[in-house]
From Swiss-Prot:
Role summary: Component of the ubiquinol-cytochrome c reductase complex (complex III or cytochrome b-c1 complex) that is part of the mitochondrial respiratory chain. The b-c1 complex mediates electron transfer from ubiquinol to cytochrome c. Contributes to the generation of a proton gradient across the mitochondrial membrane that is then used for ATP synthesis.
CDD domains given in the database record: cytochrome_b_C, Cytochrome_b_N
Subunit text: The cytochrome bc1 complex contains 11 subunits: 3 respiratory subunits (MT-CYB, CYC1 and UQCRFS1), 2 core proteins (UQCRC1 and UQCRC2) and 6 low-molecular weight proteins (UQCRH/QCR6, UQCRB/QCR7, UQCRQ/QCR8, UQCR10/QCR9, UQCR11/QCR10 and a cleavage product of UQCRFS1). This cytochrome bc1 complex then forms a dimer.
Localisation: Mitochondrion inner membrane
Keywords from the named record: Electron transport, Heme, Iron, Membrane, Metal-binding, Mitochondrion, Mitochondrion inner membrane, Respiratory chain, Transmembrane, Transmembrane helix, Transport, Ubiquinone
Chain positions recorded as heme b b566 binding sites: 97, 196
Record-given protein name: Cytochrome b
Length: 380
């Protein structure tokens, strides 16, 4: 008799996705981040659910309800900090996952890649709205500044902003709708992640060499289940070290002050994982130009498959492209640092140069490097 996991309609889906899935025999630890993102998402949904049981989305009570969770709810403090720092872990895994895709040419799986970009944008929107919910100073002013960017859209801009606000400023209506969206979006992310996996399993995984691995595939279980469990343990260890020893390391002290529309904080800045995009936004003196650059800094990922000029898929055997990739990583770290600095000399010019470099590397230098490598190998 055939095993039930291969015949049962539901178990068959799980079996083909996580047990009998043929996987390349040589995928490295960079392939662990997909499963880690799944774990992060489940963790965020669970901790978020328990926080929502005690949170009140009213401007007069939001800040107090978060304080109440930390002080009076059983283990409320650990749930709150696991949720806040879980978001940071989520973005670390996301950046690693996208970086892996760029380095090893996984973006040639077009549907998988494009759904991944949509997932990234949805996750960024979710994180932004979540940051508004505690209704601290940085929550309020962050919401005001970022939503205000839409007013740069010609003709309909201001109407659009007031429609999103639900009034003439960030107020009760804004907080309530942000809570509603912040609650529903993770479930949409989960659904999109399933579609992401569906398209991935149509082609099978890429591998570090970029060479088709059909001739040498191994079952996902037990080889990669055990590898993913190791990754999960390291992820949870890192998260709990953050939560239990330095829970406020990545937060902003200003958010421990209740929101006050009459008092602007000296430096308005988002959470660390948005700083690179924030630096690109600030580096352009024109409002509409900055907004366009902000959107393009993420949407440029959609263009990456079109800019692939190399005859090889992966960067494993392409040293010049490797140099370009790591310069891009250094540039993104520079932008992240600049995003957290005040708008003054020399940070302004450093931010502008780093922003120009970011677009230049992706749009010009990487395709040129690939063409040079093709010519060196006489692969016209």
């Amino acid at each position: 008799m055939t095993n039930i996991r291969k015949t049962h309609p539901l178990m068959k889906i799980v079996n083909n996705a996580f047990i009998d899935l043929p996987a390349p025999s040589n995928i490295s630890s960079w392939w662990n981040f997909g499963s880690l993102l799944g774990i992060c998402l489940i963790l965020q949904i669970l901790t978020g659910l328990f926080l929502a049981m005690h949170y009140t989305s009213d401007t007069t009570m939001a800040f107090s309800s978060v304080t109440h969770i930390c002080r009076d709810v059983n283990y409320g403090w650990i749930i709150r900090y696991m949720h806040a720092n879980g978001a940071s872990m989520f973005f670390i895994c996301l950046f690693m996952h996208v970086g892996r895709g760029l380095y090893y040419g996984s973006y040639t799986f077009l549907e998988t890649w494009n759904i991944g970009v949509i997932l990234l944008l949805t996750t960024m929107a979710t994180a932004f709205m979540g940051y508004v919910l505690p209704w601290g100073q940085m929550s309020f002013w962050g919401a005001t500044v970022i939503t205000n960017l839409l007013s740069a859209i010609p003709y309909i801009g201001m109407d659009l902003v007031e429609w999103i606000w639900g009034g003439f400023s960030v107020d009760k209506a804004t907080l309530t709708r942000f809570f509603a969206f912040h609650f529903i979006l993770p479930f949409i992310i989960a659904a999109l992640a399933m579609v992401h996996l569906l398209f991935l399993h149509e082609t099978g995984s890429n591998n570090p060499t970029g060479i088709p691995s059909d001739a040498d595939x191994i079952p996902f279980h037990p080889y990669y289940t055990i590898k993913d469990i190791l990754g999960a343990m390291l992820l949870i260890l890192t998260l709990m070290l953050l939560v239990l020893f330095t829970p406020d390391l990545l937060g902003d002290p200003d958010n421990y002050t209740p929101a006050n529309p009459l008092n602007t904080p000296p430096h308005i800045k988002p959470e660390w994982y948005f700083l690179f995009a924030y630096a690109i936004l600030r580096s352009i003196p024109n409002k509409l130009g900055g907004v366009l650059a902000l959107x393009l800094s993420i949407l440029i990922l959609v263009l990456v498959p079109l800019l692939h000029t190399s005859k090889q898929r992966s960067m494993m055997f392409r040293p010049i492209s490797q140099c370009m990739f790591w310069i891009l990583v250094a540039d993104l770290l520079t932008l992240t640092w600049i995003g957290g600095q005040p708008v003054e000399h020399p940070y302004i010019i450093i931010g502008q140069l780093a922003s120009i470099m970011y677009f230049l590397i992706i749009l010009v230098m990487m395709p040129v490097a690939s063409t040079i490598e093709n010519n060196l190998l006489k692969w016209k």
